[in-house]
């Protein structure tokens, strides 16, 4: 947290369930990723004996716009796509891209995967994702409802069906995400039909 700012830190959960906040100077994402890798190898905090045990690195990306409707392996084209969407989520996507490049610099032969937070909502129809503003705003500036917290909504909707012992397809579900942000999603037959964001 707070990469590039004063008082940067990493929160870890130890094997016994206790939690620690470790302060560390992280002037950039490469230093932040390097520190996380060090923690993964630390006998107290980590779970690895060698970074060679890492088969792939996953990144949760906040904004995939309408370019990314599912998770994908990072390629030059994927990086360019994420970069093209920085204007839609400047605080998040720029940091995500820097994180991808940092991992690539430190572990160039390790595959990376992106999980787009709004991809779960890509099944919404235009009547649900378009705002009541001139259509030109959508065409020119990509102003629309994208949906967020998709990884949470996907998990909760599947978990609710497991808990209730019902088939995911064929259900009408409303999910609520309340964390650092809050949103709701309406899901029908396993597809998002509307969202509050």
Language-model regions, residue ranges each:
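Glycine-rich phosphate-binding loop of actin/hexokinase-like ATP-binding domains
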Residues: 120-197
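Short beta-strand-loop/turn "lid" adjacent to the catalytic site in phosphate-handling enzymes
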Residues: 40, 44-92, 113, 119-130
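Non-transmembrane, aqueous-exposed alpha-helical and coiled segments at domain scale
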Residues: 107-109, 183
């Amino acid at each position: 947290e707070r990469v590039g700012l004063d008082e940067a830190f990493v929160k870890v959960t130890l094997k016994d369930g206790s939690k620690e906040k470790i302060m560390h100077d992280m002037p950039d994402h490469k230093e932040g990723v390097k520190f996380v890798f060090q923690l993964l190898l630390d006998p107290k905090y980590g779970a690895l004996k060698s970074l060679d045990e890492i088969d792939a690195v996953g990144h949760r990306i906040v904004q995939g716009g309408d370019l990314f409707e599912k998770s994908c392996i990072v390629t030059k084209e994927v990086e360019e796509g994420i970069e093209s969407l920085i204007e839609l989520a400047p605080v998040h996507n720029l940091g995500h891209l820097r994180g991808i490049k940092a991992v690539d610099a430190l572990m160039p032969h390790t595959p990376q995967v992106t999980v787009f937070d709004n991809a779960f909502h890509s099944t919404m129809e235009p009547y649900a994702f378009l705002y009541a503003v001139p259509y030109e705003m959508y065409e020119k500036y990509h102003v629309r409802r994208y949906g967020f917290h998709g990884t949470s909504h996907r998990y909760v909707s599947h978990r609710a069906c497991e808990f209730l012992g019902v088939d995911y397809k064929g259900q009408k579900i409303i999910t609520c995400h309340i964390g650092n942000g809050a949103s709701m999603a309406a899901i029908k037959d396993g597809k998002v039909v509307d969202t509050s964001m």
